[in-house]
Swiss-Prot record:
The gene is RETREG1. Keywords: Autophagy, Endoplasmic reticulum, Golgi apparatus, Membrane, Phosphoprotein, Transmembrane, Transmembrane helix. Residues 37-52 have a biased composition (Low complexity). Residues 330-344, 368-388 have a biased composition (Basic and acidic residues). Residues 315-326, 467-486 have a biased composition (Polar residues). The chain crosses the membrane at residues 56-76, 88-108, 115-135, 205-225. The lineage of its organism: Eukaryota, Metazoa, Chordata, Craniata, Vertebrata. A motif (LIR motif) lies at residues 449-454. The modification Phosphoserine is found at residues 145, 147, 149. GO terms for biological process: negative regulation of neuron apoptotic process; reticulophagy; sensory perception of pain. Homooligomer; oligomerization is enhanced following endoplasmic reticulum stress and is mediated by the reticulon homology domain. Interacts with ATG8 family modifier proteins MAP1LC3A, MAP1LC3B, GABARAP, GABARAPL1 and GABARAPL2. It comes from the Eukaryota. This is Reticulophagy regulator 1. Belongs to the RETREG family. Residues 1-55, 109-114, 226-493 are cytoplasmic.
Length: 493
């Protein structure tokens, strides 16, 4: 809806030209009467010069008013609309124009009178265009008068604060700041002087690093952008959006940190459990150092030392000594002591039948008991010989070598005694071969397996060459020798 407004007369043309016909004609002045004792002509000339200066100043003021008055008034009326960004397109164009004018004035090499000439030329062109557009038809004047008489009122309430309100609020805040600073100056002038000097020093340093043109342009930007942010609550909208994003980010970071804490606690629990299990295992299975074990094993075979059980589950042996156990008395020379102890029981009889040393080692035991003993000792003897032969090829320490050599010596002596006994009893077994032929075959087989002097093929060849008669004669002679030895040994039995 529209409301009538008081009509205002509008005249076309420049303000100076329009005001000229409306101004009343100056009243005619009567020629001044010369008072008595008129002033000299020099004073009249000075008064005329003063009037000319005043007229020239009035003309310059009229020209300046014509040149800048109407644009200034137009910009003043439109400033509220442009700076409040009610019409974004107009405000954007004004912002671009202000930037162009600023950088033109800042970068142009022209002098001041060149700039003034350009401003006057621009104003004349604007006035000509205005007269041509508004004075083309008569209806334009009528329409202009109606449009100025009636004003359109927007029924929608504008919730945004106006530019005048923003300016008023800013001016009020600035006035309050000045009042507080004046009170602060009265209460503590020294602190006020120090504060002012600090601010001036700050701006001096800032101006030495940043040119004044940049600072002026920043002021221009603030003049356009601060009302935009303040009147449209852009800062509040941006803050609300950023706050929502920050809340989401805070929640995400908090959840991530809590998850990492849970994972770290679980890892610590597993590590502690693993450490406990490792401690249990280490208690059950102690670790033995290789150097310590080698040092403990590097012992001599000369002296005997006591054995002590260490904490790590090994024997503690002093260097240069061998361990002593309950059964270590018979480990050095067991078979030699047994042989020397029983050697006195062997008969030392010379029967004049041409017997050799092997006949003297015969024990004269019954044939059946000796055969059973040979059958029982045949298998273990071969295994011990194989073990002793295999053990010689291994790298052994001194005590192990001593035990091995003692065992080997005992085995050799036992084998020699057994061989001698078998040789003496071979004749008796061959004499009984007719009653038990299988017994003679077993004896021949055992003799061949024990001594292994010839291969089986060589024995077969020798038997084929000599014949059975020679074998039978040798067996008869052997029976005579063995029977003579046994009769002398057993006596009246």
């Amino acid at each position: 809806m529209a409301s009538p407004a008081p009509p205002e007369p509008a005249e076309q043309g420049s303000p100076a030209l329009a005001a000229a016909p409306q101004a009343p004609p100056p009243p005619t002045r009567a020629p001044p009467e010369e008072p008595e004792g008129a002033a000299p002509p020099e004073e009249g000339a000075a008064a005329g010069a003063g009037r000319q200066v005043e007229e020239a100043a009035g003309g310059v003021a009229a020209v300046v008013t014509w040149l800048l008055g109407e644009p200034a008034l137009w910009l003043g009326g439109r400033a509220d609309e442009l700076l409040s960004w009610k019409r974004p397109l107009h405000s954007l164009l004004a912002f671009v124009g202000a930037n162009l004018v600023f950088w033109f004035l800042a970068l142009t090499p022209w002098r001041v009178y060149h700039l003034i000439s350009v401003m006057i030329l621009t104003r004349v062109i604007m006035q000509i265009i205005k007269d041509m557009i508004l004075s083309r038809t008569r209806g334009a004047q009528l329409w202009r008068s109606l449009s100025e008489s009636w004003e359109v009122i927007n029924s929608k309430p504008d919730e945004r604060p106006g530019f005048s309100h923003c300016l008023a609020e800013s001016w009020m805040n600035f006035s309050i700041f000045l009042q507080e600073m004046s009170v602060f100056k009265q209460q503590s002038p020294g602190k006020f002087c120090l504060l002012v000097c600090s601010v001036c020093t700050f701006f001096t340093i800032l101006g030495s690093y940043i040119p004044g043109v940049i600072l002026s342009y920043l002021l221009l930007l603030c003049a356009f952008l601060c009302p935009l942010f303040k009147c449209n609550d852009i800062g509040q909208k941006i803050y609300s959006k950023i706050k929502s994003c920050l809340l989401k980010l805070d929640f995400g970071i908090r959840e991530y940190i809590n998850q990492k804490k849970r994972e770290r606690s679980e890892a610590d629990k597993e590590k502690s459990h693993k450490d406990d299990s490792e401690l249990d295992f280490s208690a059950l299975c102690p670790k033995i150092s290789l150097t310590t074990a080698a040092k403990e094993l590097s012992v001599s075979d000369t002296d005997v030392s006591e054995v002590s059980w260490t904490d790590n589950g090994t024997f503690n042996l002093s260097e240069g000594y061998t361990p002593q156990t309950d059964t270590s008395d018979d480990l050095d020379r067991p078979s030699e002591e047994v042989f020397s102890r029983d050697l006195s029981d062997f008969p030392s009889l010379e029967n004049g039948t041409g017997t050799n040393d092997e006949d003297e080692l015969s024990l004269g035991l019954p044939t059946e008991l000796k055969r059973k003993k040979e059958q029982l000792d045949g298998g273990p003897r071969r295994s011990t010989e194989k073990k002793s032969a295999a053990g010689l090829s291994l790298p052994l320490s001194s005590d192990q070598t001593l035990h091995l050599m003692s065992d080997l010596a005992g085995d050799v002596i036992t084998a020699a005694v057994t061989a001698a006994v078998k040789d003496q009893l071979a004749g008796v077994r061959q004499a009984l071969s007719q009653a038990a032929p299988s017994l003679g075959e077993d004896t021949d087989t055992e003799e061949g397996d024990d001594f292994e002097l010839l291969d089986q093929s060589e024995l077969d060849q020798i038997e084929s060459e000599l014949g059975l008669s020679q074998d039978q004669e040798a067996e008869a002679q052997q029976n005579k020798k063995s029977s003579g030895f046994l009769s002398n040994l057993l006596g009246g039995h």
